[in-house]
């Protein structure tokens, strides 16, 4: 069986949860089936990572599509799509609700690989790749990995603030288009049973299975007490749920924590926009942006993890990282969605600012609350992986 996977970006280095999930999956699957991988490269400097990726995936045929070499005219459909998206996001400050458009050269590139490598199954991942189902020949089976239901993410965003009627009707259109596109696939795979049930109730007739992203469990990691007054968040500002959640936390929770303990520090790991970093470090005390780190265990050791996610869907790799490294965590109902961790026993779940702050402060001073939940969740994660 020859399997083609298309991603919306190069999965290396694994600088965010999405890339971690895709990279870890490829590392495992390369030993099981014949895999071909296609992803776009938008800037020439990204090709510097190509050799490193191929070294990590020696059994995978890797075909980068070099967007920077295939420039379209300003009047092309793809160029107009990119311009429209930039205007909507950066100038109007609104969620982008139009259907993705692909380059002619990219569509031809994918179909040529399907023909040349005699592909049997095409697996598209992430919303950016969803509508490629209409460009792929019917001679192959089509699978979609639904990491996040876009229309659910938008609906949760609309609950936080008012948007114009035009934005809301566009969101309704996107919901219908997303469901229709999913129905063109032979198989849909969600990250959680919750997302699976949502899609089934909302009219997705294609077969759906739930399977979380794979994450390797490191060896020789032991529990350490949170001796420092430090909390940590993992994720970049490019993913809107991260930016939304961290902003909410800084605006509503951080001052409550510092009021009780002014020595607390907040470390953010991941790529963040430089303007946002400058603005937030001027506005908030004891805030540190760490960027991408090679040794995650060293940075988050003895830290309390916070996952203040309010919008989006899917599974939070941040929580799985916390479990991996024995880090106690405080999260929201949306943040822990799809993971059956028990509030008060395995973590603290809080949706209100005061309750969230209280949860962080309680973990910081209660050694039993630090040790028992993380030890239990780590053991359960190992048992679950052993059963897969």
For each predicted feature, which ranges?
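Acceptor-binding helix/loop patch of EC 2.4 sugar-transfer enzymes
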Residues: 8, 74-100, 143-176, 236
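Conserved catalytic-core segment of nucleotide-activated headgroup transferases in glycan assembly
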Residues: 210, 215-279, 289-293
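Acidic donor-binding loop of glycosyltransferase active sites
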Residues: 300-314, 325-327
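Conserved acidic donor-binding segment of nucleotide-sugar-dependent glycosyltransferases
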Residues: 347-353, 362-367
């Amino acid at each position: 069986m020859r399997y083609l996977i298309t991603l919306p970006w190069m999965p290396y280095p694994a600088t965010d949860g999405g890339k971690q999930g895709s990279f870890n999956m490829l590392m495992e699957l390369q030993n099981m089936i014949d895999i071909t991988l296609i992803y776009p490269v938008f800037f020439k400097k990204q090709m510097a990572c190509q050799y490193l990726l191929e070294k990590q995936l020696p059994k995978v045929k890797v075909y980068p599509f070099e967007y920077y070499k295939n420039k379209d005219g300003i009047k092309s459909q793809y160029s107009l799509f990119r311009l429209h998206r930039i205007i909507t996001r950066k100038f109007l400050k609104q969620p982008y609700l139009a259907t993705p458009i692909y380059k002619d050269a990219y569509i031809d590139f994918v179909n040529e690989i399907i023909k040349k490598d005699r592909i049997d199954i095409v697996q598209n991942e992430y919303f950016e790749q969803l509508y490629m189902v209409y460009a792929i020949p019917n001679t192959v089976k089509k699978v979609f990995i639904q990491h996040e239901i876009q229309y659910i993410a938008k609906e949760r965003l609309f609950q936080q603030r008012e948007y114009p009627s035009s934005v809301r009707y566009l969101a309704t259109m996107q919901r219908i288009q997303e469901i229709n596109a999913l129905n063109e696939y032979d198989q849909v795979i969600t990250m959680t049973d919750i997302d699976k049930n949502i899609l089934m109730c909302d009219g997705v007739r294609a077969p759906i299975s739930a399977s979380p992203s794979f994450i390797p469990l490191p060896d020789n990691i032991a529990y350490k007490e949170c001796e420092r007054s430090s909390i940590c968040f993992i994720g970049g500002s490019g993913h809107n749920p991260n930016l939304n959640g961290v902003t909410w936390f800084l605006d509503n929770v951080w001052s409550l924590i510092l009021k009780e303990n002014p020595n607390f520090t907040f470390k953010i790991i991941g790529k963040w926009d430089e303007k946002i970093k400058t603005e937030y470090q001027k506005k908030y005390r004891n805030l540190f942006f760490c960027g991408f780190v090679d040794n995650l265990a060293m940075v988050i050791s003895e830290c309390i993890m916070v996952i203040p996610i309010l919008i989006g869907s899917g599974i939070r790799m941040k929580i799985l990282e916390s479990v991996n490294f024995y880090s106690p965590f405080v999260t929201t109902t949306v943040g822990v969605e799809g993971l059956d961790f028990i509030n008060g026993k395995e973590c603290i779940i809080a949706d209100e600012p005061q309750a969230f702050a209280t949860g962080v402060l309680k973990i910081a001073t209660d050694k039993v609350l630090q040790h028992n939940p993380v030890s239990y969740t780590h053991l359960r994660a190992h048992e679950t992986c052993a059963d897969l």
